């Protein structure tokens, strides 16, 4: 578009130059014919010659003013093109330095079963069972029940303290998100010397990777170093709804993070008074929704658009310089013709 406008302006300016040259030549021929008709002995009047010179001077002034304005316009266009080039390069560098975070969601039919690492301490696991949508009423709370979950006990050294041993109960998490699968666990703590009772837990992305790992202790040390841990208290049923976030790092690696929403419901203890001294813990793990959130940094700077814009700006600079050069030549040529005709008129009068 810029190239077409500039080409059209160039053609119009060339046509104006040719018209000015033709008009000047025709004026010279008319003057010569007038001198030949009047003869060598006839001298035109001083008033007519002065009026003719004044008209020509006015036309030359207008042409010079027009040429100067045209040059100023082209210089302004050149300044705008230079600023556009500078701004384009600056924006491109800023976009390279500051990528934009992109968030997308991928729907899945089922998840890879996560690992649930529980640190019960002195608490005892009473029951662990997979349910779908609804948890049936407790038949005998505080008493051992069904255990149809895949679990494994493991002891390992704390990753931040070599003198502390960690004892973890690893439970396979839910998979069927569309069927609203959930895992319900019940613990019992007989005696505790602490003022507050709670059980720590952490979530990691794949229970299968844990089972296939030759160094399970090292695997759990890495998980405890990378993931955050949470707690659920006794005397309540804590419902944990999990969601998975995958973040793509700058080096191409993919980091997995669990986000969770918890809701706590008070447990109405209807056991006999003799059994109420035993603290009960209830926890439910369920997927929040079937969408995996993927986060990555993207660079919005498009090099091809930048190159195209720079090419257009440089083309505008080139055309503006060409027009300015042509305008200067035109102004010099008009000035020379004016001086030449002025000299001829002076010689003719003398």
Curated annotation (Swiss-Prot):
UniProt xrefs under Pfam families: TMEM206
Entry membrane topology: Multi-pass membrane protein
Protein family (similarity comment): Belongs to the proton-activated chloride channel family.
Gene Ontology terms describing biological process: chloride transport
GO molecular function: pH-gated chloride channel activity
Cellular location(s): Cell membrane
Keyword Transmembrane: yes
Entry protein name: Proton-activated chloride channel
Gene Ontology cellular component list: chloride channel complex; plasma membrane
Cytoplasmic compartment spans: 1-64, 319-350
InterPro entries: TMEM206
